[in-house]
Amino acid sequence: MHSHSTLILEAHDIQKNFYHPVQVKILQSVSLQVQMGESVAIIGRSGEGKSTLLQILGTLEQPCSGTLTIDNQLISSSNKSQIRNELIGFVFQSFHLLEDYTALENVLMPARIGRKSVAKGSLTEQRGMELLHQVGLQERAHFHTKLLSGGEKQRIALARAMCNDPKIIFADEPSGNLDRQTAHLMHEILLKFIHGQQKALVLVTHDPELAKLCSSQYELINGCLYRR
């Protein structure tokens, strides 16, 4: 058993069914442990339920049964939004950026939701600029997002995921919409951040190259999770 000092996430016996119109078992008795500083890749065929699992682990979706503990806190309906805001960062395939806002405003959005001051010169704004620097986009800070390329948008989404200094980042096909070269750069930035700052990463991908860069690989087959 892992020591609890480094365990950031523990999922136990997660089950998820959908009904349309008959019952379909999406996830069956899925259990997973993730340590601080660990990067976990979950691969599997399309339609296996990878994104559903990621959303459950990230507290965005409710399992039918099973337990989820993040940072030694058992997730419940009463604490999950606070835990999500304080401990979790998300990177989605489709970016989910606000197109009429600047790159910096998008990066600072989690801080704004958390009611932190994002005024010019504030520590939070300085952190936003530092994150844009880390992803190589400080020159684009005041550009509206709609003017930027797909690769730039995904790097902004990555910087935004890091804004509240989360302990764990969940990434759903983070390079799914990017060309090979841009995807490679994105993977480097993501993993450098995770390993350099002792964060944890759980990502869903069907890119074997990206999966190999992670410290642990799992495969979802017929609703069951297997370590590779």
Curated annotation (Swiss-Prot):
* Localisation: Cell inner membrane
Which SUPFAM superfamilies does the entry link to?
Answer: P-loop containing nucleoside triphosphate hydrolases
* Keywords assigned by UniProt, alphabetized: ATP-binding, Cell inner membrane, Cell membrane, Membrane, Nucleotide-binding, Translocase, Transport
Which GO cellular component terms are attached? plasma membrane
Domain named ABC transporter is located at: 9-228
Q: What is its main location?
A: membrane
EC number(s) in its UniProt entry?
A: 7.6.2.-
- What are this entry's molecular-function GO terms? ATP binding; ATP hydrolysis activity; transmembrane transporter activity
Topology relative to the lipid bilayer, per the entry, is:
Peripheral membrane protein
> Which positions bind ATP?
44-51
**Family under the similarity heading:** Belongs to the ABC transporter superfamily. Lipoprotein translocase (TC 3.A.1.125) family.
Q: How does it assemble?
A: The complex is composed of two ATP-binding proteins (LolD) and two transmembrane proteins (LolC and LolE).
Give a short account of what the protein does: Part of the ABC transporter complex LolCDE involved in the translocation of mature outer membrane-directed lipoproteins, from the inner membrane to the periplasmic chaperone, LolA. Responsible for the formation of the LolA-lipoprotein complex in an ATP-dependent manner.
Could you tell me what this protein is called? Lipoprotein-releasing system ATP-binding protein LolD
What organism does the record attribute this protein to? Answer: Protochlamydia amoebophila (strain UWE25)
